[in-house]
């Protein structure tokens, strides 16, 4: 330990505009709230806190659009869409972007079959019509590869899914589905990403010893809740949460090398909290995915800009505003320039 010398601590003198703070925030960075678009399959279910379609699960705006005709059974099968099915899927994507979606996620893990199709169509449509980008992640499985960097040598990531058999089937069929989509598009999609051999961006092999696929088939109440309709559905989510947490803990005891959990099943995402408490391990899920994508549009740009101020003058307190939930849009005259002339020049391509 080095020598510690006590020095008087002086708080910086910062002046805040408490009268018209939001007007000043607008001048700095804009406060249009980030919007997440949820692409839905043609399937109705009761949403609950923690579900990707429940607005209480996020602190930003959520909109949704349904790919009509793409039922759960069809999504699970991953069969090729006919011309009508493809148009209905693309129409749902257009609705999301036209209504302000900054990025798009799916409400069903099986939508991973259309990751490439939706991603490339969304990017193309958003760019041509609005001159912007629209990131797409249809499944939390896209987090599997980067999460491997977080676990120790010999460790595993437990991938939690509703049905182990169904998820194993996805691995076998996904490359075929993607290849068919590429052929339909004249091979354009394979050239739109750096790794043409894996254009989905989901580089995962469930036979990799670093992954442990765990199905919730044995959790009876959860399976019943998935299968049930209307009044027959299981409503006591606390009981289901306890069952899932206990099941994961038992799996963990048999597989102590599991260092983290990744929830693939969208409807199981609402129980991530129970797994965290029950197992003591970090858990990532579809909600994590939405929050991760939202951070590409929010928080630090307004906060840092407001804290620094223009040329260091009179910074605002970001915690006293909602700027952290907004994105720097450049839609209002002069707002980019308020961050400094160089930022306006960057946007105009003159710097």
Curated annotation (Swiss-Prot):
Top-level taxon of origin: Eukaryota
Entry keyword Nucleus: no
Lyase among keywords: yes
GO terms for MF: dimethylpropiothetin dethiomethylase activity
Catalytic activity: S,S-dimethyl-beta-propiothetin = acrylate + dimethyl sulfide + H(+)
Residues annotated as the enzyme's active site: 108 (proton donor/acceptor), 265 (proton donor/acceptor)
Swiss-Prot/TrEMBL keywords: Lyase
EC number: 4.4.1.3
Membership in a protein family: Belongs to the aspartate/glutamate racemases family. ALMA1 subfamily.
Additional facts recorded: At least 10 million metric tons of volatile dimethyl sulfide (DMS) are released into the atmosphere annually by the dimethylsulfoniopropionate lyase in oceans. It is a component of the tangy aroma of the seaside and functions as a chemical attractant that guides various marine animals, such as sea birds, invertebrates, and some mammals, toward potential food supplies. DMS oxidation products act as condensation nuclei, causing water molecules to coalesce, with possible effects on local climate through enhanced cloud formation.
Functional description taken from the UniProt entry: Mediates cleavage of dimethylsulfoniopropionate (DMSP) into dimethyl sulfide (DMS) and acrylate. DMS is the principal form by which sulfur is transported from oceans to the atmosphere and is a key component of the ocean sulfur cycle.
Complex formation: Homotetramer.
The protein's name: Dimethylsulfoniopropionate lyase 1
Natural source organism: Emiliania huxleyi (strain CCMP1516)
């Amino acid at each position: 330990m080095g020598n510690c010398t006590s020095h008087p601590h002086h708080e910086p003198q910062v002046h805040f505009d408490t009268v018209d703070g939001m007007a000043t925030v607008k001048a700095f960075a804009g406060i249009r709230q980030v919007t997440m678009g949820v692409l839905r399959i043609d399937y109705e279910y009761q949403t609950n806190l923690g579900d990707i379609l429940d607005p209480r699960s996020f602190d930003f705006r959520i909109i949704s659009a349904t790919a009509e005709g793409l039922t759960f059974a069809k999504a699970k099968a991953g069969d090729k869409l006919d011309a009508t099915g493809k148009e209905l899927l693309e129409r749902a994507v257009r609705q999301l972007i036209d209504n302000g979606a900054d990025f798009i996620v799916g409400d069903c893990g099986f939508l991973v079959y259309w990751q490439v199709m939706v991603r490339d169509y969304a990017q193309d449509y958003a760019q041509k019509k609005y001159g912007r980008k629209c990131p797409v992640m249809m499944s939390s499985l896209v987090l599997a590869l980067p999460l491997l960097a977080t676990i120790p040598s010999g460790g595993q990531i437990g991938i939690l899914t509703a049905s182990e058999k169904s998820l194993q089937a996805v691995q076998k069929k996904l490359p075929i589905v993607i290849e068919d989509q590429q052929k339909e598009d004249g091979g354009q999609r394979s050239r739109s990403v750096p790794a043409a051999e894996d254009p989905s961006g989901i580089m995962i092999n469930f036979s990799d010893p670093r992954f442990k696929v765990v199905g919730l088939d044995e959790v009876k109440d959860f399976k019943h809740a998935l299968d049930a309709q209307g009044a027959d559905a299981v409503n006591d989510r606390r009981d289901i949460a306890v069952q899932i947490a206990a099941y994961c803990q038992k799996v963990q005891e048999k597989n102590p090398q599991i260092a983290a959990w990744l929830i693939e099943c969208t409807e199981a995402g609402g129980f991530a909290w129970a797994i965290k408490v029950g197992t003591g391990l970090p858990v990532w899920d579809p909600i994590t995915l939405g929050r991760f994508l939202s951070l590409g549009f929010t928080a630090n740009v307004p906060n840092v800009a407001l804290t620094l101020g223009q040329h260091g003058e009179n910074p605002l307190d970001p915690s006293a505003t909602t700027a952290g939930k907004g994105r720097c849009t450049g839609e209002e005259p002069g707002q980019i320039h308020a961050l400094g002339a160089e930022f306006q020049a960057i946007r105009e391509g003159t710097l």
